[in-house]
Each structure stands twice: as C-alpha cells, then as structure tokens.
C-alpha cells in the first residue's frame, strides 16, 4: 500500500503522496482506531493504567529512535547496504533475549533461527552489497545502531507483557507518541493534502498498521522472543507473494527461491514436537557403579 500511494508501483495513481504524509495518516488513523477499540470496552482508564511508566517511556523512545536511525540510514547509504548491515539484528535480538530475559534457546530454536537468518541472507545477499560498498564513514554505523535499538525494543516489549501489561495498551502508547512526531517532516517539506482517491487506501493502511502493532504485541505476550524470531523472516515470503499478486512481480533469481524455501523450513521446524529434538540434546553421562 505504501508503495502504491507513493507512486512506486506500476499501477496508475494520479497524485502520489510523500512518504511522510502517508506515515502521518497511517499513525493518526491507527491511533484513533485503537482508542475507539479500548473505549468500547468501557475500561479505557483501567487498561491504560500502568505501574511501569518509565519502562513504557523507554520502549517508546527506542521505537521512535529506531525508526529515526533507519530513515537517516536510507538518506546517506544505499538501500541494499542498509538491508545488509541490518542482518545483525536477529543475532542481537537472540543474545539480548537469552542474556536479559533468560529465555530458553534449545536445539529446536537454534536450528529455526539459523535457517531463518540463512534464508533472509539468500534473499537479500548482503555480502554483495558490502563487497561493492564504497562508503567507509561513520554513516555505516547508523543501520547497526538501528538494528541494536530495534532489538532492544523487542526485549522491552516482552518484558512489559511479562509484567501483565495489555497488548492494546502498548499499541496505544506507541501510536499516540509516534503520531505527533510524524508531523515534524511536514514542518520542513510542507503539508500535502490527500485526495478522495487516497482516503480509502489510507484508512486501510492505518487499520492494517494498528492491527500489525497489536498482533506483534499479542504474539510477544504469548511466546518468547527466541521462538517468534524465525516467523519474522516469513515477512519476506509474504512480501514476495504480495508483489506477485498485486504488481505481477515474480522472483527471478535462484537465490530468492532458495531463500523462500529455507525460511519456510525454519517455521516448519518450530511446528515439530520438541521431544524430537530432545533426543539429540546432550544427556548427562551415567555415574559409574
């Protein structure tokens, strides 16, 4: 939807919108929808009441900072190199989840994470981007910092939900804070009003964005970070499928198809009964009689 509204798709659009305008309306619509949902439960104050205001604040800051660093990276570094350097994010996330949250990282999850990272690597081929890179400045640190901050955001989300915070509350706090920030680019670039042609798509985009944030938080309420991480790589498959259905774009490289297959295997590994992997785990040696 963002690609279509910004004029980057082959589908016709009379007046493309700037990215910052799309993001502003997406966040505003998402905030209004999640507010209406909480209000309908008649527990608005109760659900938004929190005993961890500073942890909420820290999480919101990390989310906003991560987005800012990501967009700043795209300003100074080619997209392929930003994506390449961002491949360190799953590794940082796993380390943070194991060291900070003390999550289980058994053989089954290790295999799934390794497969998902490998599949993403095959699709994006960050090695080619880095080999061809001519940028050797501090700008290269920006996507690395963004990856670190996004990983910290996942850990903070899981920690808040472990302390019985509501997934809807986390979604509301995030969108309510980020929506006003979306106005900042307009102070520099100027306001661009959407037309009636844009409004249905912006409404759909805002709804899907709010749903995605809520689903993300709900998932982290129900499962550990190390378990959910391989499923995040599946978005590459979904994006490829959406590109085929909407834009008629078919992956043409063998690496792309191989990467999709490997990521699919990573999610299948997590569906296998854990008892199967316990057979291969290290067992204590029997004591001598």
What are these regions (language model features)?
Residues 7-12, 19, 25-58, 131-135, ...:
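Membrane-interface interhelical linkers
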Residues 28, 60-68, 90-95, 121, ...:
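Hydrophobic/small/kink-forming positions within alpha-helical transmembrane segments
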Residues 233-289:
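C-terminal-most transmembrane helix of multi-pass membrane proteins
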Residues 82-88, 160-177, 213-245:
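Helix-helix packing/entry segments at the starts of transmembrane helices
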Residues 18-32, 72-89, 135-149, 195-209, ...:
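Structural signature of hydrophobic alpha-helical transmembrane segments
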Residues 27-31, 87-91, 113-120, 175-179, ...:
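Residue-level recognition of pore/gate-forming positions within transmembrane alpha-helices
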Residues 1-3, 68-73, 121-132, 178-192, ...:
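Hydrophobic alpha-helical transmembrane segments in multi-pass integral membrane proteins
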Residues 86, 102-122, 133, 137-139, ...:
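Loop-to-transmembrane alpha-helix entry segments
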């Amino acid at each position: 939807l963002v690609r279509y509204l910004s004029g980057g798709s082959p589908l016709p659009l009379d007046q493309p919108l700037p990215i910052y305008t799309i993001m502003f309306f997406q966040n505003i619509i998402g905030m209004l929808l999640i507010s209406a949902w909480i209000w309908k439960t008649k527990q608005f104050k109760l659900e938004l009441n929190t005993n961890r205001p500073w942890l909420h604040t820290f999480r919101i800051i990390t989310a906003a900072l991560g987005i800012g660093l990501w967009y700043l990276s795209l300003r100074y570094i080619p997209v392929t190199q930003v994506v390449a350097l961002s491949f360190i994010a799953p590794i940082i996330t796993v380390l943070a989840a194991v060291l900070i949250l003390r999550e289980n990282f058994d053989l089954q999850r290790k295999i799934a994470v390794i497969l998902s990272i490998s599949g993403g690597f095959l699709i994006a081929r960050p090695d080619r981007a880095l080999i061809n890179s001519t940028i050797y400045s501090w700008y290269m640190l920006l996507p690395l910092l963004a990856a670190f901050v996004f990983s910290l955001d996942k850990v903070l989300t899981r920690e808040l939900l472990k302390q019985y915070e509501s997934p809807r509350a986390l979604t509301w706090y995030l969108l309510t804070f980020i929506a006003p920030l979306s106005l900042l680019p307009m102070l520099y670039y100027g306001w661009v009003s959407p037309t009636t042609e844009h409004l249905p798509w912006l409404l759909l985009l805002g709804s899907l964005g709010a749903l995605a944030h809520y689903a993300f938080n709900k998932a982290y309420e129900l499962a550990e970070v190390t378990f959910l991480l391989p499923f995040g790589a599946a978005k590459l498959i979904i994006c490829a499928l959406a590109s085929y259905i909407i834009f008629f774009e078919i992956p043409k490289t063998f690496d792309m198809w191989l990467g999709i297959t490997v990521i699919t295997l990573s999610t299948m590994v997590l569906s296998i009964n854990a008892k199967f992997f316990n057979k291969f785990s290290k067992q204590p040696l029997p004591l001598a009689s």
